[in-house]
């Protein structure tokens, strides 16, 4: 009788332990889903600095991180995080960058027209380039352009070499870009008169490739 009662008490404990393990599995699965969502973005840490604050008891040290986040397909953002530890500063920078996402108009892997951006003492000049040129830019500007999905571009820093100024000047330049349709509508001209034929051809080709990729994804998803 004693063995039966002990066995009866053991069964609920086994179920509880299984339920708790299953609950942990579901929670872990949820975290995995969020991690996989974040992994779809490109992240670049441009600069990490240690700063100190003098207080009555001495000095307090903290770290700042300048982070670029983008989807590699026209979306990019810049974040600046500050914390007592480097990983926490980077995490804060990533969250701020994702909140500040903006769309960059691209045609065939390059920008739509030359543009110059300024921020504080930073000045960055961006020029479109032909396919195969690559990203010809310095480290800080390159991080922004690569995360934005730009594959061919000429970039030159005309002002301060400070990474923070260069990054913000590059972002300012990208935000000034306009699509050919916007320029044509503002001038009251057909789009062929404001955009080179090569650019329009590259846009048609990129749109055709994107449409083909969507159809292929839909076809593969419909197959059993």
Swiss-Prot record:
One of its GO terms (biological process) is translation. PANTHER family: MITOCHONDRIAL RIBOSOMAL PROTEIN S5 (PTHR48277:SF1). The gene is rpsE. Disulfide bonds: none annotated. NCBIfam families: rpsE_bact. It holds the Pfam family Ribosomal_S5_C. Coiled coil: none annotated. The N-terminal domain interacts with the head of the 30S subunit; the C-terminal domain interacts with the body and contacts protein S4. The interaction surface between S4 and S5 is involved in control of translational fidelity. This is Small ribosomal subunit protein uS5. Residues 1-38 are annotated as: Disordered. Belongs to the universal ribosomal protein uS5 family. One of its GO terms (molecular function) is rRNA binding. InterPro entries: Ribosomal_Su5_D2-typ_SF, Ribosomal_uS5, Ribosomal_uS5_bac-type, Ribosomal_uS5_C, Ribosomal_uS5_N, Ribosomal_uS5_N_CS, Ribsml_uS5_D2-typ_fold_subgr. Residues 41-104 form the S5 DRBM domain. The keyword Lyase does not apply. With S4 and S12 plays an important role in translational accuracy.
